[in-house]
């Protein structure tokens, strides 16, 4: 099992290293700031951002004065997060790491947060245990997870119809199902609030160009196209263009699409 797991994790790392995720993360900067605002962090709060990407969550938390540590599987993301924090003159620490084997002590953080990040780790039960382990008793685990029925969940489903996901890996969007999240944390949390929230993807170009944008910059989409021959790529492109067009709320040549996610805030018992 371990060699298979190592191979899967290597593929996942290659996927998230492909493209330039920061170009995608820009699209929900405002949503990330709103997510942080709802956490009502205080100066000095010790926060860990798991799978931090380029710092969408970590940086607004650092602006508030939280004591922020971010970690990500992809070294390029860690570097970008550091650079983004330095650009604003913020103090935050960023590490390369694995959500399933966090390199931090037990009970180290007041808040353990993850926005569209830890949900992609291949073993959700292991991930849940690690999020809890590094959180102080009475501290909070905060997650933003795409739902199966929301737009991004539908985009994943569309892509999977052309390029099946790795065998044996539970769908990441199951983290967007409240009952599943409650089952994964179980009695190890004393409370759990789950709320449907919406993020708007806004781009100053057409849905057709949005698909090309994702193909260029979003690792999972780039890898999906790379796994297909010319005809397969054309079919995937058409389906994704149709999906973005059907959900587009703009008629002026630009794109605005709403995507639901599940916001989870749990208190460690």
List where the protein language model places each region:
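A short acidic, Gly/Pro-enriched loop at the edge of an enzyme's catalytic core
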Residues: 100-111
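Conserved class I S-adenosyl-L-methionine
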Residues: 2-45, 56, 80
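A short SAM/SAH-binding and catalytic strip from SAM-dependent methyltransferases
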Residues: 110-124
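Class I SAM-dependent methyltransferase SAM/SAH-binding core
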Residues: 46-102, 126
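Conserved catalytic/acceptor-binding region of the Class I
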Residues: 125-126, 132, 136-205, 225
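Conserved donor sugar-nucleotide recognition element shared by glycan-biosynthetic enzymes
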Residues: 5, 24, 28-32, 74-77, ...
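Conserved Class I S-adenosyl-L-methionine
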Residues: 28, 54, 174-269
């Amino acid at each position: 099992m371990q060699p298979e797991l190592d191979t899967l994790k290597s593929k996942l790392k290659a996927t998230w290293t492909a493209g330039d995720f920061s170009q995608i993360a820009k699209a929900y900067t405002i949503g990330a700031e709103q997510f942080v605002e709802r956490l009502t962090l205080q100066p000095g709060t010790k926060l860990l951002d798991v799978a931090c990407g380029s710092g969408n969550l970590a940086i607004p938390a650092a602006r508030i004065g939280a004591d922020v540590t971010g970690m990500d599987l992809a070294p390029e993301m860690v570097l970008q997060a550091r650079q983004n924090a330095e650009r604003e003159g913020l103090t935050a620490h960023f590490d390369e790491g694995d959500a399933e084997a966090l390199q931090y002590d037990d009970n180290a953080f007041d808040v353990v947060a993850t926005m569209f990040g830890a949900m992609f780790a291949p073993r959700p039960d292991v991930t849940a245990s690690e999020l809890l382990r590094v959180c102080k008793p009475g501290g909070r685990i905060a997650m933003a997870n795409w739902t199966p029925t929301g737009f991004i969940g539908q985009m994943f489903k569309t892509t999977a119809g052309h390029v099946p996901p790795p065998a044996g890996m539970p769908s990441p969007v199951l983290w967007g199902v409240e009952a599943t999240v409650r089952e994964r944390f179980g009695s190890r949390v004393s409370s759990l609030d789950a709320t449907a929230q919406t993020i708007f993807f806004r781009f100053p170009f057409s849905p057709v160009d949005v698909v090309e944008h994702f193909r260029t910059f979003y690792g999972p989409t780039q890898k999906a196209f790379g796994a297909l021959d010319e005809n397969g790529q054309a079919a995937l492109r058409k389906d994704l263009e149709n999906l973005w067009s059907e959900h587009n709320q703009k008629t002026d040549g630009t794109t605005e699409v709403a995507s639901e996610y599940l916001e989870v805030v749990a208190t460690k018992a």
